[in-house]
């Protein structure tokens, strides 16, 4: 991973990361990181390198990658999931879903189908959509995918900015980001969300 990061820098390309997730969308339910220490060590080093850059977007990516470490180690989401409120997923059949990370073994529901209504607002503002959002608020998965994390990082930027500033200053002063110190932000999230 770190070699790819350096290659992307040399090519002046952006570098994005992800971890295994299980869901109906991926047609996979048995993904598991088995070499947790090695993978988290690589993410740790990536975070250190991202925080050395002079680009605030890289610092935000460092925060996202800290969330990946937390996810891989089985922790709760650092920020709430607001899938179905801040974003949605449209499948090829017209189903409007809160996200593409749902598992039938956990829960699976649609907000509605575009083929059955006159316009999107009928789905987005429906009672069914409200029911699905309540399920999201109690979802046990603790996913950490860019599609659901990026919107809440932007929404709660004033909450995560102190972490970014503190750790940028640490790196400037020659220290490392402590990736064992995982921040959690309570911004109205349901206490049941992310309890695996």
Segments predicted by a language model, with ranges:
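Radical SAM enzyme [4Fe-4S]-AdoMet core and its adjacent flexible, acidic
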Residues: 1-83, 87, 91-92, 96-97, ...
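Flexible mid-to-C-terminal extensions adjoining Fe-S/redox cofactors in radical SAM and related proteins
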Residues: 95-96, 100-196
